[in-house]
Structures are given as structure tokens and as C-alpha cells.
């Protein structure tokens, strides 16, 4: 990751002139579109003929990932012309104001993509971090022009294309015969018709994400699962999906990641996953599915064996209580990451149950958890922090809690467990599930290294005294 904001504009090109021609992959955390365009634009020297143009900086780049202020036609065209070996292009912008036409992406810009025919992976995303904004100057025609040059594309991710309809998205599915990964975010005109004739295509999709696409219904999923080799299915914030969608998903034998956040599913609907799907799932998220109760735990796990599940997100479930977590602990699911933030009925009993849980007889209490997020759970008190000490949760590396409970206790816990990252300001722990599915940006859940093990073994026996003092001191004030 490279942060271009550390350099003045006139020094930026000088820095990259020193870069090795062998550099093949580059990720820049932030750069302005103007600086990038100037960097990659070929120039003609004072005594140089137009036929002898300076070769592009970074000629060997194959993978380019950029976060910019605005994705523009000029920038896209410059990248497409100048980087002749490019196979992966990932562009994300975060506008502060609504872009003018000269600082925006239009149909013309899409037409310039993949001029050298080597591009396999394309991602164009407009973030709404600062304001609600879209690629308003791109419509179905732009997608059609792009698809003509991208028939060999394997992965396409599009976010914020509010003028693109079913016609544009279907063009991608029918033109890109090698496509295996499709990601659409905030496709406000995307409907069930996009997937209506999936069985008529030659596609073998393995990764599909359609997030914030509120016109999709259960019928879309019934057609989508004709791709029986699906491994990742991200349906977050598609509010019209319900139990019938889960019933359709239940036929997928290779599904590894399923994200259903904010959907209209119920406890009984989750029971469709028991058997074929739950035994293959590695990651499951049902965050914000308001109809779910404690019964969803039994619907998923009771009577299930040899589970591969490592990551479970049951956050923001108003009807999930300690009883559900007690059942989860009883089922001995070998989870590595458990997120249950903002559950008002979750309290100290849940932490005690997880701390006491044994996945198998040869490992310690609560030994499988590397990440635990209990931020803003309504029933968490100082008592829970006693169960976050050693020897409980020996592998825990990430903990999310509410800092207002007792700052001194949190600070003492951080000092006594120096290899535990404690987040107390509502930070989301871990990474985006979509990226996790690709194993490109895996979070650091490593086992103890040799130095860490030596330090832990050498700790004195009274290491918890600070936490005891932190609990007593507030009572004496």
C-alpha cells in the first residue's frame, strides 16, 4: 500500500521515475486523478519528435489498485493506453462533491477500457462515504461499449451505476463467457430479469455479490443457483429476500461464504441450510435480520457435525439473547471469529459461556476464538471482563467492546494481554467478507510466534492484579 498524499504534486512523478521496471503490482491508498493522469501521460521532450514519445512509467504493471478523488474519463483512458500489460484494474473513488462532467466517468470512458485486450479483472466503485453519489453519466450504452472489448473478462465489479438497467447487466452476462465473479453494488435498477435465463448462458459463476439491490426477490435467487458451483454468495441489504431464497440456496454443495445481512429471513428459513450447505460453509452472516431469535442457533447447528464454519456474524439481532449463545457453546461449533455487536439482550452470561466452551478435549477453554466482537451489547458489565482474562480465550487476538463500560478495565486488559487488539470506539473488526473469500487480504489470525510464546510463558503469576485494582477502584470513589 502506497500513500501518494505524502508527496507534493510536482515531486510525485520524480519518485516514480525511480521505480523498478520489474514492478508488477501496485496499490495506492489515495492519489488525486490529476496527479495520476500526469504521471502516466506520455510526454514529448523539447527536441523529441512525436513519434519518439517517452515510454510509460511502470511499464510492467499488471495489477493496479487505486483509491482516488474522482474516477474520470481522462484517467481511465490514460491508464488503459499507458499500461500495456495490465490484467487487473481496481478503481474506487470517494467524491466530496457531486462531480462535474469533466471530472466524472461517462460512456466514453468505459469505451476506452481494455485497449490492449489483456484485462481479466475490472472493478469500478463509487463510495458514498461522504455523500450520496453515483456514476450518473453512465448508462446501458456505456456498458454495451465496454462489454464489446471485455469478452475475455473473468471478474467484473461495479458499484454505484444508478442509470444502468437490466439490459446493461445482462449484456455483461451474455458477452463475457469466461466470467466467474460478478459484483454489483447499489444497482438500483437491477431486477430479477437479469438472472431470468441464467441456464441459457455458458457461465460458471463461483462468486456473486449483489448488494443494496432492493428490487431483487426470491425468484432471482432461484434462477441464480443454476450455477451450482457457487462458492461465495453476497446478498447483503437485499431487503426483499426471504426464506424461499434460502430454500433455493440449500442445493449449493460447494458454498463457502453466505452473507444475508438485512434480509427478511426467519428461524425456520435458516433450517433449510442444515445438511448440505451448513456442512460446507466457512463464513455465514445474518447481521440485522430482525426476525431471527434464539431459535436460529438450533435451526442451524443442533444435530450438525463436522462443521467447517469459522466466521459467524449474528450482530444487530434484537431478539437474540444469552440463551442462544449458550446453545451455540453447547453445540461446540469451532468458530474462529464471532461477531454479535449491538445485540441488546446479550450480556455477561454469553461471555462466560464462550469462555467455558471446549471445542474438543485436547484444547483449552474458548480456544477456537481469534475474534470476538461484543460492542454495544446491552447486558455486558464489568463481570464479563473477568472472563476475558487468561486462561480463557487463549487464542483471542481481536476484541470489540464498548469503551464507556469502564475505561480503566479496558486499558488494564490491553496491558495484561499485549497481543490482544482491543477496539472500543465502534470499529469494525476484520475485513470485508467478499475479499476474505478470495484469500487475497486475509486478516492476521496467526498462531503465537516463538517470541510471543516466550514472552507469555515468562509472565509473572500476578499479571491480573491491575484488572482487579481497576474493578475495585471505581467502587472506592
PLM features per residue range, with description:
Residues 13, 18-23, 35-75, 82, ...:
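C-terminal capping region of solenoid repeat domains
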Residues 4-11:
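Short amphipathic N-terminal alpha-helix
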Amino acid at each position: 500500500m502506497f500513500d501518494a498524499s505524502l508527496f507534493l504534486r510536482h515531486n510525485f512523478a520524480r519518485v516514480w521515475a525511480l521505480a523498478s521496471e520489474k514492478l508488477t503490482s501496485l496499490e495506492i491508498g489515495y492519489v488525486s486523478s490529476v496527479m495520476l493522469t500526469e504521471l502516466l501521460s506520455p510526454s514529448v521532450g523539447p527536441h523529441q519528435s512525436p513519434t519518439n514519445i517517452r515510454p510509460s512509467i511502470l511499464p510492467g504493471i499488471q495489477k493496479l489498485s487505486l483509491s482516488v478523488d474522482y474516477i474520470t474519463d481522462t484517467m481511465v483512458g490514460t491508464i488503459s493506453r499507458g499500461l500495456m500489460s495490465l490484467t487487473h484494474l481496481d478503481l474506487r473513488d470517494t467524491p466530496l462533491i457531486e462531480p462535474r462532467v469533466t471530472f466524472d466517468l461517462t460512456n466514453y470512458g468505459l469505451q476506452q477500457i481494455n485497449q490492449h485486450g489483456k484485462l481479466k479483472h475490472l472493478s469500478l466503485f463509487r463510495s458514498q462515504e461522504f455523500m450520496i453519489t453515483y456514476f450518473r453519466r453512465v448508462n446501458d450504452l456505456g456498458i454495451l461499449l465496454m462489454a464489446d472489448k471485455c469478452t475475455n473478462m473473468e471478474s467484473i465489479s461495479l458499484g454505484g451505476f444508478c442509470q444502468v438497467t437490466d439490459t446493461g447487466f445482462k449484456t455483461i452476462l451474455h458477452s463475457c463467457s469466461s466470467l466467474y465473479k460478478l459484483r454489483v453494488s447499489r444497482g438500483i435498477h437491477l431486477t430479477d430479469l437479469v438472472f431470468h435465463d441464467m441456464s441459457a448462458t455458458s457461465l460458471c459463476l463461483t462468486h456473486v455479490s449483489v448488494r443494496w439491490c432492493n428490487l431483487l426477490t426470491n425468484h432471482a435467487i432461484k434462477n441464480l443457483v443454476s450455477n451450482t458451483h457457487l462458492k461465495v454468495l453476497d446478498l447483503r441489504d437485499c431487503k426483499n429476500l426471504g426464506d424461499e431464497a434460502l430454500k433455493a440456496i440449500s442445493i449449493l454443495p460447494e458454498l463457502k461464504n453466505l452473507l444475508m445481512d438485512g434480509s427478511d429471513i426467519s428461524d425456520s428459513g435458516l433450517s433449510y441450510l442444515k445438511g448440505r450447505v451448513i456442512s460446507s460453509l466457512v463464513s455465514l452472516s445474518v447481521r440485522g435480520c430482525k426476525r431471527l431469535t434464539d431459535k436460529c442457533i438450533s435451526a442451524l447447528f443442533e444435530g450438525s457435525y463436522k462443521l467447517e464454519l469459522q466466521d459467524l456474524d449474528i450482530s444487530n439481532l434484537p431478539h437474540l439473547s444469552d440463551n442462544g449463545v449458550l446453545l451455540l457453546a453447547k453445540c461446540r461449533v469451532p468458530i474462529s471469529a464471532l461477531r454479535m455487536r449491538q445485540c441488546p439482550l446479550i450480556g455477561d452470561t454469553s461471555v462466560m459461556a464462550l469462555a467455558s466452551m471446549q471445542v474438543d478435549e485436547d484444547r483449552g477453554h474458548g480456544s477456537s476464538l481469534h475474534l470476538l466482537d461484543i460492542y454495544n451489547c446491552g447486558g455486558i458489565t464489568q463481570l464479563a471482563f473477568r472472563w476475558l482474562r487468561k486462561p480463557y480465550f487463549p487464542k483471542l487476538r481481536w476484541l470489540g467492546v464498548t469503551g464507556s463500560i469502564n475505561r480503566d478495565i479496558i486499558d488494564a486488559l490491553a496491558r495484561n494481554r499485549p497481543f490482544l487488539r482491543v477496539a472500543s470506539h465502534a470499529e469494525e473488526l476484520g475485513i470485508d467478507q467478499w475479499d476474505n473469500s478470495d484469500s487475497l487480504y486475509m486478516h492476521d489470525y496467526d498462531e503465537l510466534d516463538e517470541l510471543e510464546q516466550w514472552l507469555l510463558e515468562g509472565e509473572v503469576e500476578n499479571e491480573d492484579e491491575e484488572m482487579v485494582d481497576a474493578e475495585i477502584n471505581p467502587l472506592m470513589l
